[in-house]
């Protein structure tokens, strides 16, 4: 009996891969493996639990116990569409340390564990990814990152209709696809996304867009604040951390947070001194998820953007072990 581990993202492609493995290796030890950023759409959880139930496969859920926004505050770094630290820390590092070193993260949950046929499911396991031919640029890095494991990507080598697989099991697709998102990640808040993606978020889920926009403003100002010599050296206490952490965790807006949000136009004005960066160079503009445009700017002029700039996480590509 062989071991098969499916990286189960909550998307249609990874579900098709799970069905493929179950169909071709019904008597083997198969595991659905989900790394949770705690930032996902509520309907994603409905989908992964229903998938586990109908496929009759065990699902292991691992998490660091923090969201991408909380990670940015901890690291004092704005994850963005050039550097996806949230994907690296909350997904890639979690899974790599567990499967290669046996390190269990802060949060571990099981669903349908009784379907697990052997508790030793990691040894000589084949790892499966829901990567299709349109994402073949991810194939090489994933294979390199996961040596010495054997890697399989059935959607590259086989013609599989995701919607037909959903119909086969009578499972409704995640609602993010109904909202015309290209993937079902992070409730449309993926920081590696582009203008077209965030424009769609603004039109389809304005509440989530506004929450993310405000987090971008506050985290940017907090990072700038932390780069000041007195704070960075520890000579002066960090008077903002508690308020910023509570804001990104619960949405509560203290007076400090309200001052940042209400003064956002001044905070990014050309005549304001934003401080210096790690190299001692002047910080010329606020930190943003996208390179050239803040979400606040996008909200004000949503039509004047590149609608074809979709972007996305590309998990398990940019990762080197510590």
Regions found by a protein language model. Give the residues of each.
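Nucleotide-activated chemistry modules centered on ATP-dependent adenylation/adenylyltransferase
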Residues: 1-322
